[in-house]
């Protein structure tokens, strides 16, 4: 059998590759909360809209039309058979899914909750500076919990990053 010999350059490259792989494998790992339970809410269907409006008004630098919003199917404060929660994508807003989510809600006679995901829709010098995966996941969990208050059965609609969040939370 013929012995394969590697040049000095290939040996250095392979050794470097092995070192990089070891450093990567032993390096820091992000700490992600594995608790996928939805938060307990301190609001009722009668007070949810006021609560969300007040919370959004406290956000400094909130861009126009980026606030979380409930669109009632019929009458404010009344549950419907279905509600739709729309989780938007990275750096997007509720308008990313328009007009699809509006038409879906209308077709199903559903209440529609359009949340603003954590740190999104805010005018800042350094956008998303304080955003972490846990904070983003928590805001999606809250959105789902609020949406469940509005209905008997929840329909989750999402795009892009919102889709990743929806799949992650639905996996439990």
What are these regions (language model features)?
Residues 95-99, 135-142, 164:
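Extracytoplasmic/secreted proteins, especially bacterial periplasmic and envelope-associated proteins
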């Amino acid at each position: 059998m013929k012995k394969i010999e590697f040049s000095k350059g290939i040996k250095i490259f392979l050794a470097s590759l092995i070192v990089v792989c070891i450093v990567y494998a032993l390096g820091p790992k992000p700490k992600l909360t594995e608790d996928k339970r939805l938060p307990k809410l301190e609001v009722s269907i009668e007070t949810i809209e006021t609560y969300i409006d007040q919370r959004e008004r406290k956000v400094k630098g909130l861009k126009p039309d980026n606030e979380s919003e409930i669109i009632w199917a019929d009458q404010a404060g009344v549950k419907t058979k279905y509600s739709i929660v729309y989780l938007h994508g990275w750096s997007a807003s509720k308008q990313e899914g328009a007009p699809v989510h509006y038409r879906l809600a209308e077709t199903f006679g559903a209440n529609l909750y359009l949340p603003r995901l954590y740190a999104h829709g805010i005018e800042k010098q350094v956008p998303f500076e304080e955003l972490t995966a846990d904070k983003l996941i928590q805001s999606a969990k809250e959105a789902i919990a609020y949406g469940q208050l509005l209905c008997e059965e929840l329909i989750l609609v999402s795009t892009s990053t919102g889709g990743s969040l929806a799949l992650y939370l639905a996996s439990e």
